[in-house]
């Protein structure tokens, strides 16, 4: 799209919502983002161009204040709107590293993990914080549709709750639990058959999904578990998808889950927990309009409470699993601008020093982002360009047709809302090292992920001796 074919905003400051929404997921940039006296983007009291100068690029910049406020809003919202007990657990697949786990733990969150690696990372962080074995066991929930025997054994060893996804896993756990000599805590994941409007790849609640037990399997599952003294079934779980703006699907989910929860009680199962998953969306563009954290929590909490009242059952412990809406808006990625290519009457390309290896979402989900020049936030916007990554791949486009000042080599470009599923989905494509990440707060910047070096890229390589002869 040519710059003459669309109205251009005035400056890069349009990324800053004024006033900022108190709910982090409703902003493009972190809550602490401002433009300083030099016309530079500042986050957490730190100049973004100065951070790039110190730590290099590409660079993930995570704002501690935004992450903490999102966590606090989730906890406070469920406490305010749900009459029973509640627990917010962080869906660590969004971004799993020691520092993010530590912050979430300090804010009273539990953890949803989906692999042995995420489990190891979470347990490592919690031990460094001084948590004991009982605290760790209580706060971790292990997900996944194809957990290995080794992963199940690791989960059993720390006594965390395992969310069972299918018959094979259930039967495997029965044997492993018997071998361990102690009951294993489980929950059941069901597929509720609820549709929501989001990308096909991140829908999980409709019937045609790889996750969970279908409703027509549940009574047989209840019967089986009731006969297994080694399995202690705490409750039910469902997750209907991600990046959801609608309220109705989670209202419906609460009602469906409570119906099956009530049914499970009639089989004598000691159900006490109900896990509604996550899915609240965030702003990636100005036109995105997700509910606030409190609005989402209120809808879900009231739906479950009213359904329990209708069924005349005690309120179960209500669990929610936000991921994207906790970390997504708390982070930006900074790049250095490189070359320019002008295709007359078609498109202007601006290349940066990262791309699909540090943010695969555009090529995977056709995700749309907003960008600005962090060193020239007040400069007049003059053109529409397409931001290209540096990979040997035609599809390596970070943002299409975005309005910017005339970018020059060495400018610092930031992509907004990159906290979720950027670092966690990053790769070494074209043998690029994964970027560093810094945590910023009140003018202080701390490295939380080191930049991978060439040596790191070879760390797992093996060269057989026979190839050297």
Swiss-Prot record:
Instruction: Give binding positions for pyridoxal 5'-phosphate.
Output: 279, 321-324, 421
Lineage: superkingdom: Bacteria
Pathway given for this chain reads:
Amino-acid biosynthesis; L-lysine biosynthesis via DAP pathway; L-lysine from DL-2,6-diaminopimelate: step 1/1
Write down the top EC class of this protein: lyase
Per its UniProt record, the required cofactor names are: pyridoxal 5'-phosphate
Which residues does UniProt mark as catalytic?
392
GO molecular-function term, one example from the UniProt record: pyridoxal phosphate binding
CDD domains in the record: PLPDE_III_DapDC (cd06828)
Q: Mind telling me which Gene3D superfamilies this protein's record contains?
A: Alanine racemase (3.20.20.10), Lyase, Ornithine Decarboxylase, Chain A, domain 1 (2.40.37.10)
Residues bearing N6-(pyridoxal phosphate)lysine are 93
In this chain, substrate is annotated as bound at: 324, 361, 365, 393, 421
Under Enzyme Commission nomenclature, its number is: 4.1.1.20
Catalysed reaction(s) here are: meso-2,6-diaminopimelate + H(+) = L-lysine + CO2
Q: Which GO terms describe its biological process?
A: lysine biosynthetic process via diaminopimelate
Q: Which UniProt keywords apply?
A: Amino-acid biosynthesis, Decarboxylase, Lyase, Lysine biosynthesis, Pyridoxal phosphate
Which residue ranges are recorded for the region named Disordered? 1-23
Its job: Specifically catalyzes the decarboxylation of meso-diaminopimelate (meso-DAP) to L-lysine.
| Quaternary structure and partners | Homodimer.
PANTHER family, from UniProt? DIAMINOPIMELATE DECARBOXYLASE, GROUP IV DECARBOXYLASE
Q: Which family does it belong to?
A: Belongs to the Orn/Lys/Arg decarboxylase class-II family. LysA subfamily.
Q: What is this protein called?
A: Diaminopimelate decarboxylase
Source species: Synechocystis sp. (strain ATCC 27184 / PCC 6803 / Kazusa)
Recorded name of the encoding gene: lysA
């Amino acid at each position: 799209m040519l710059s003459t074919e669309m109205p251009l905003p005035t400056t890069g400051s349009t990324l800053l919502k004024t006033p900022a929404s108190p709910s982090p997921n409703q902003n493009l940039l972190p809550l602490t983002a401002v433009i300083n006296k030099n016309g530079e983007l500042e986050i957490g009291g730190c100049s973004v161009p100065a951070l790039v100068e110190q730590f290099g690029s590409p660079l993930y910049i995570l704002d501690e204040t935004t992450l903490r406020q999102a966590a606090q809003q989730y906890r406070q919202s469920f406490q305010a709107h749900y009459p029973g007990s509640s627990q917010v657990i962080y869906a660590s697949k969004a971004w799993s590293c020691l520092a993010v786990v530590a912050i979430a733990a300090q804010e009273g969150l539990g953890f949803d993990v989906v692999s042995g690696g995420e489990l190891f990372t979470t347990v490592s962080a919690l031990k460094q914080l001084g948590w004991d074995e009982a605290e760790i066991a209580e706060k971790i929930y292990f997900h996944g549709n194809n957990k290995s025997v080794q992963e199940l054994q690791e989960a059993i060893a720390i006594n965390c709750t395992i969310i069972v996804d299918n018959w094979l896993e259930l039967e495997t756990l029965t044997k492993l639990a018997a071998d361990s000599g102690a009951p294993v805590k489980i929950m059941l994941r069901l597929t509720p058959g609820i549709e929501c409007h989001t990308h096909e790849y991140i829908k999980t609640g409709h019937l045609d999904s790889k996750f969970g037990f279908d409703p027509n399997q549940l009574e047989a599952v209840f019967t089986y578990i009731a006969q297994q003294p080694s399995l202690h079934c705490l409750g039910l779980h469902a997750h209907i998808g991600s990046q959801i703006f609608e309220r109705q699907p989670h209202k419906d989910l609460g009602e469906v889950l409570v119906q099956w929860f009530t049914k499970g009680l009639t089989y004598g199962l000691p159900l006490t927990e109900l896990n509604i998953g996550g899915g609240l969306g965030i702003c990636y563009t100005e036109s995105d309009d997700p509910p606030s954290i409190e609005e989402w929590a209120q809808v879900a909490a009231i739906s479950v409470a009213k359904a329990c009242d209708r069924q005349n059952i005690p309120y179960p412990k209500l669990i929610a699993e936000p991921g994207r809406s906790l970390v997504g808006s708390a982070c930006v990625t900074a790049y250095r601008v490189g070359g320019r290519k002008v295709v007359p009457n078609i498109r202007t390309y601006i290349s940066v020093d990262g791309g699909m290896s540090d943010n695969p979402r555009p090529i995977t989900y056709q995700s749309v982002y907003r960008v600005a020049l962090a060193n020239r936030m007040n400069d007049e916007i003059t053109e529409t360009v397409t931001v290209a990554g540096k990979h040997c791949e035609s599809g390596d486009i970070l943002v299409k047709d975005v309005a910017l000042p005339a970018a020059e080599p060495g400018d610092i470009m930031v992509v907004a809302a990159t906290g979720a599923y950027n670092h966690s989905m990053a790769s070494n494509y074209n043998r690029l090292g994964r970027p560093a990440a810094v945590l910023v707060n009140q003018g202080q910047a701390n490295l939380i992920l080191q930049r991978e070096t060439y040596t790191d890229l070879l760390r797992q390589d093996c060269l057989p001796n026979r190839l050297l002869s």
